[in-house]
């Protein structure tokens, strides 16, 4: 990975041939090349996209098994592949990284635990050769995601930054099943992969888990910022604290984003919506700044709980919906921030107006009438 490359250098003829209509061709993520997981090194892939279509560990509304498909569909809409220059950050991740879609992990609707082990194996394969970005699936996939990623890289102590409406630290989840989507953080903690002091939760609200679980979290040194606290605080302060905690004495950092952290008006397509969540500008800004502050070579990311059956403007996932489109945007933002971190930059080369922001000198204002 060097900052001398361009998208054309990385993708060659595929870059030039990518501008086919969005409704044609193989619907990989962003219409990127599909590369078998055992071929990532041969193809010089830097970031591997992996689907984890598991939802049998959910507890309320199922449907996230279709999340990877919907996010891939949404990813074909905004702009041509390999061309994602961000006017705000001034970076196009495809000028820095070679990215490929590695398909989906094998899942069996009749065997939740075996499906999770299959996901762990698939993430391990990706992580041996590339940075994993995983699309869920319910939130139970994050435990095998982290297990496979850590084992492939020899990480013994990881930091975790967790965006979610729920803490997911239940000893036996929500149902008495220790591997359901409400227990994965506790599984990571119990495996001694993460110290409580290296964990930060952003956005919890509502009525689960109960006070006993939060007391245990506090005793373990875990920290959280509720959705209302996020709304009333400086986002940069939250980001700085979460990053400092996640990187203090750790080998690497995983960021996990559950779309139910969002206000349901902006992310209706999920299994357990809860009023009072984050708005997109808050979430995008914090994810952008968190990832930019981390080492892209010791990093992993997943976005989970996209359930397209409940989404707005999604009919059979032909082009995705509001929620799947938001998940797609997060992934592109993550890759853009990784590219900035790889280059050691706070920002790329955003294109600014000739005049500074604010009223032009010739513009009349109400004060001029006094």
Description of each model-found segment:
Residues 2-370:
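Conserved alpha-helical scaffold segments that buttress catalytic/binding sites
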């Amino acid at each position: 990975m060097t900052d001398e490359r361009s998208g054309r250098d990385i993708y060659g003829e595929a870059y030039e041939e990518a501008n086919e209509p969005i409704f044609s061709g193989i619907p990989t993520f962003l219409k990127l090349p599909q590369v078998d997981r055992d071929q990532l090194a041969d193809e010089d892939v830097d970031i591997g996209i992996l689907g984890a279509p598991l939802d049998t560990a959910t507890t309320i509304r199922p449907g996230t098994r279709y999340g990877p498909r919907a996010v891939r569909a949404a990813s074909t809409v905004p702009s041509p592949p390999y061309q994602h220059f961000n006017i705000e950050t001034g970076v196009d991740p495809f000028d820095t990284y070679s990215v490929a879609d590695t398909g989906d992990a094998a899942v069996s609707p009749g065997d939740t635990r075996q499906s999770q082990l299959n996901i762990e194996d698939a993430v391990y394969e990706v992580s041996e050769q590339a940075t994993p970005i995983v699309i869920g699936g319910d939130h139970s996939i994050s435990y095998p995601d982290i297990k496979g990623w850590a084992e492939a890289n020899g990480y013994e102590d990881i930091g975790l930054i967790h965006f979610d409406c729920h803490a997911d630290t239940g000893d036996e989840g929500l149902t008495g099943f220790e591997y359901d989507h409400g227990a994965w953080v506790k599984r990571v903690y119990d495996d001694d992969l993460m110290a409580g002091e290296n964990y930060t939760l952003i956005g919890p609200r509502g009525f689960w888990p109960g006070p006993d679980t939060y007391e245990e979290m506090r005793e373990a040194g875990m920290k959280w910022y509720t959705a209302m606290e996020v709304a009333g605080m400086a986002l940069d302060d939250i980001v700085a604290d979460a990053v400092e905690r996640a990187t203090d004495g750790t080998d690497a950092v995983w960021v996990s984003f559950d779309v139910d952290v969002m206000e349901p008006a902006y992310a209706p397509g999920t299994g357990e919506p809860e009023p009072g969540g984050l708005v997109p500008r808050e979430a995008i800004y914090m994810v952008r700044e968190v990832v930019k502050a981390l080492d892209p070579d010791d990093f992993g990311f997943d976005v989970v709980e996209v359930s397209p059956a409940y989404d707005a403007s999604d009919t059979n996932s032909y082009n995705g919906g509001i929620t799947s489109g938001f998940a797609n945007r997060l992934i592109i933002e993550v890759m853009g921030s990784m590219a900035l971190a790889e280059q050691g930059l706070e920002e790329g080369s955003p294109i600014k107006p000739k005049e500074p922001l604010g009223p032009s000198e010739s513009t009349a204002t109400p004060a001029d009438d006094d």
